[in-house]
Curated annotation (Swiss-Prot):
Protein name listed in UniProt: Large ribosomal subunit protein bL27
Family listed: Belongs to the bacterial ribosomal protein bL27 family.
PROSITE patterns the UniProt entry points to: RIBOSOMAL_L27 (PS00831)
Gene3D superfamilies cross-referenced by the UniProt entry: 2.40.50.100
Gene Ontology cellular component list: cytosolic large ribosomal subunit
PANTHER family referenced in this protein's UniProt entry, alphabetically: LARGE RIBOSOMAL SUBUNIT PROTEIN BL27M, RIBOSOMAL PROTEIN L27
Name of encoding gene: rpmA
Keywords carried by this UniProt record: Ribonucleoprotein, Ribosomal protein
HAMAP family (UniProt xref): Ribosomal_bL27
Leader sequence segment: none
A single BP term in Gene Ontology: translation
Recorded GO MF terms: structural constituent of ribosome
Region (Disordered): 1-21
UniProt lineage: Bacteria, Pseudomonadati, Chlorobiota, Chlorobiia, Chlorobiales
Pfam families, per the entry: Ribosomal_L27
Amino acid sequence: MAHKKGGGSTKNGRDSNPKYLGVKAAGGSTVSAGTIIVRQRGTVIKPGNNTGIGRDHTIFSLVDGVVTFRNGRNDKKRVEIVPS
């Protein structure tokens, strides 16, 4: 007879690495060109004036200015930069 219990298998015990998604520059804050404004999965927030979008849907600033969030058509949220 075994004097130790067998190590049973389990379906738990895993965790994924954090992805650090979300808004990185709040509305009204001043940003410089190239600053990441939003990191997201899919286009939850659409890019507006003076912003660009990366291949992973990250929205970033193209000019120096102030971040502005606004609601566009069809309930789509947009972020844009007002140049300073």
